[in-house]
C-alpha cells in the first residue's frame, strides 16, 4: 500500500525510539522499488498516551524544505486547542505543476473533533503568515462524521466555508474498514488556487485495499481500521 505513493501520512504511530519505523523503512526500501525517506514528529498528546505524525516520502520525487509544530497554547494549563497539534511540513516537488506545498496533518480527539477541525482555520492563517503560501493540504483522521461531527455542526466550522479550500473527500465517503460503520472520518482538504488547479480531476478517493487485494474483513482490519484517502497532483 505504501509503495503506491510518493508521500504518505501515517498516524497513531507510537514508537518513540523509532525501532518500528526504521524496520518499516528497511522493508519498504528493500522491496527494490523506489527510495523512501521519512520525517516524524515528537510524541504528541496531553496525557501519557502520545502519538506521532509520520510522513514517508519518495526521496527521488520530493524533498522536505522545512517543518514546525503549530503552537496551540499551553498544554499544562489545559488551554491548548489540539490533542495532537499539527506537525506542519513543507515539501519541494519538482515534477508537479505546484513545486512547493505544505502538508498539515491532524488526528483529532473524537470528543472535540468539531472544535479541532474548526481550529484548522487558525493553522491555515498561521502557515500563510509564516511561509507566505496558501498551497496547503490538510489531511488525516479528522473524525469528521457520524457521532463526532454532526450535520448541525458543519456550518460553524470555519475551514469548511473557507473559499480558498476544497474538501476533496465528501461526507458520503466511508473511510472505515468495519462493515458496521459508514463514516467519512478521514479527509483531504486542498487550499490555494495553484494547488487546487494542480489536482488531477476525480483522483481524490478512498483506497479500499480490502477490495483491491480481495481480503476478508478480519485480515483488512489487521492492516488498519481505516482505509487510506488519496489524491494525485498533475505532473508538469
What are these language model-derived features?
Residues 1-236:
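Divalent cation-coordinating acidic motifs and surrounding scaffolds
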Amino acid at each position: 500500500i505504501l509503495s503506491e505513493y510518493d508521500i504518505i501520512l501515517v498516524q497513531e504511530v507510537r514508537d518513540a525510539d523509532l525501532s518500528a519505523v526504521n524496520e518499516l523503512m528497511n522493508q519498504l526500501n528493500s522491496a527494490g522499488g523506489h527510495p523512501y525517506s521519512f520525517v516524524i514528529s515528537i510524541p504528541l498528546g496531553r496525557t501519557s498516551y502520545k502519538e506521532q505524525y509520520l510522513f514517508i516520502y519518495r526521496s527521488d520525487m520530493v524533498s522536505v524544505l522545512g517543518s514546525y509544530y503549530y503552537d496551540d497554547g499551553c498544554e499544562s494549563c489545559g488551554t491548548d486547542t489540539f490533542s495532537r497539534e499539527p506537525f506542519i511540513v513543507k515539501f519541494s516537488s519538482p515534477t508537479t505543476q505546484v513545486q512547493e506545498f505544505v502538508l498539515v496533518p491532524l488526528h483529532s480527539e473524537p470528543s472535540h473533533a468539531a472544535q479541532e477541525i474548526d481550529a484548522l482555520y487558525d493553522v491555515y492563517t498561521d502557515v500563510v503568515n509564516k511561509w507566505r503560501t496558501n498551497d496547503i493540504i490538510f489531511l488525516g483522521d479528522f473524525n469528521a462524521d457520524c457521532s463526532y461531527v454532526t450535520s448541525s455542526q458543519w456550518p460553524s466550522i470555519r475551514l469548511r466555508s473557507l473559499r480558498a479550500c476544497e474538501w476533496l473527500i465528501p461526507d458520503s465517503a466511508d473511510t472505515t474498514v468495519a462493515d458496521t460503520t459508514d463514516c467519512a472520518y478521514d479527509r483531504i482538504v486542498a487550499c490555494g488556487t495553484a494547488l487546487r488547479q494542480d489536482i488531477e480531476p476525480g483522483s481524490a478517493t478512498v483506497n479500499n485495499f480490502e477490495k483491491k487485494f480481495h481480503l476478508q474483513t478480519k485480515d483488512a482490519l489487521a492492516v488498519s481500521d481505516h482505509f487510506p484517502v488519496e489524491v494525485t497532483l498533475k505532473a508538469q
